[in-house]
Amino acid sequence: MSAQVMRPGTPQHEGQEFLSGTDEELAVAMRHYLAYSGRFTVPDMASTENSTRRVIHEVEMSSYPNWIGTTQERVVHIKGDILELSTVHPLVISGIEQRSFLTWRKLPRLT
């Protein structure tokens, strides 16, 4: 599993050299970006509370180093062609407690 999330409108760096930038440019870029990856498991629905579907991400690498070696549990909602993942508990982001959501729509098969 690999997740890459970037806030729209992240400012470009002044220089054109790859992986370069001022300390301020690099800090802004990191505040606008989150990536993590690792194995995932989907517990049996019979073993979860209220039959809520969950997915558990075992974080092996992350742009937020505090998550490395942890598990991140997400709530799964599937309705028709829509898949939504959300945090189980609120996260504190910029001093504000909030739940995060990611939504995907399954595209029709190309023929």
Curated annotation (Swiss-Prot):
<feature type="region of interest" description="Disordered">
    <location>
        <begin position="1"/>
        <end position="21"/>
    </location>
</feature>
<comment type="pathway">
    <text>Secondary metabolite biosynthesis.</text>
</comment>
<dbReference type="InterPro" id="IPR024311">
    <property type="entry name" value="Lipocalin-like"/>
</dbReference>
<comment type="function">
    <text>4'-hydroxy-3'-methoxypropiophenone carrier protein; part of the gene cluster that mediates the biosynthesis of 2,4'-dihydroxy-3'-methoxypropiophenone. The first step of the pathway is the conversion of acetate into acetyl-CoA by the acyl-CoA ligase ppsA. Acetyl-CoA is then used as a starter unit by the polyketide synthase ppsB and condensed with 4 malonyl-CoA unit to produce the pentaketide backbone. During polyketide extension, the polykedite chain is probably reduced and dehydrated by the KR and PT domains, respectively.</text>
</comment>
<protein>
    <recommendedName>
        <fullName>4'-hydroxy-3'-methoxypropiophenone carrier protein ppsC</fullName>
    </recommendedName>
</protein>
<dbReference type="Pfam" id="PF13924">
    <property type="entry name" value="Lipocalin_5"/>
</dbReference>
